């Protein structure tokens, strides 16, 4: 179990309260697909992902990005129980989708970049520290069901 100080919890929940999940989620997923093109294979049903322009303009990217950011809001609300929060999602990504665990870390890195770009003034090193800790905990919780 990870220990969160009151200040860390406040920095995480305070910033998360400002997040527009639609806007940030769409940007995060688009960045993931562009920067790490091998992740596109998990989204073959999305159609054209052949270029950054195609990815950004793809109508299936924003809703799935919103879904990702919305699901990331769950551990923000349950900082003391992240592993159980992601139990079902871990099972889905392990057994059905067969997503390699390294991809969770990459998505966490993208989330940090998106938060930093949208909230540059608020996303100080002191704020980044608990967020890095959170994405690391999430990246370790998601592959929990892997064998």
Curated annotation (Swiss-Prot):
One of its GO terms (cellular component) is hemoglobin complex. Keywords: Heme, Iron, Metal-binding, Oxygen transport, Transport. It holds the Pfam family Globin. CDD domains: Hb-beta-like. One of its GO terms (molecular function) is oxygen carrier activity. The keyword Transport applies. Heme b binds at residues 64, 93. One of its GO terms (biological process) is hydrogen peroxide catabolic process. Red blood cells. Residues 3-147 form the Globin domain. Belongs to the globin family. Beta-type chain found in early embryos. PANTHER family: HEMOGLOBIN FAMILY MEMBER (PTHR11442), HEMOGLOBIN SUBUNIT EPSILON (PTHR11442:SF7). Heterotetramer of two epsilon chains and two alpha chains. This is Hemoglobin subunit epsilon. It comes from Cairina moschata (Muscovy duck).
């Amino acid at each position: 179990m990870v220990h969160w100080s009151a200040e860390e919890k406040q920095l995480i929940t305070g910033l998360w309260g400002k997040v527009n999940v639609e806007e940030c989620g769409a940007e995060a997923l688009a960045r993931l697909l562009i920067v790490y093109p091998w992740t596109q294979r998990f989204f073959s049903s999305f159609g054209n992902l052949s270029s950054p322009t195609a990815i950004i303009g793809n109508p299936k990217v924003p809703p799935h990005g919103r879904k990702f950011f919305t699901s990331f809001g769950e551990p923000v609300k349950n900082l003391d129980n992240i592993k159980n929060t992601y139990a079902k999602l871990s099972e889905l990504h392990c057994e059905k989708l067969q997503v390699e665990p390294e991809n969770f870390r990459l998505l966490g890195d993208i989330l940090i970049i998106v938060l930093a770009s949208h909230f540059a003034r608020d996303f100080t090193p002191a704020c980044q520290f608990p967020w890095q800790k959170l994405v690391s905990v999430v990246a370790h919780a998601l592959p929990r069901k892997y064998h």
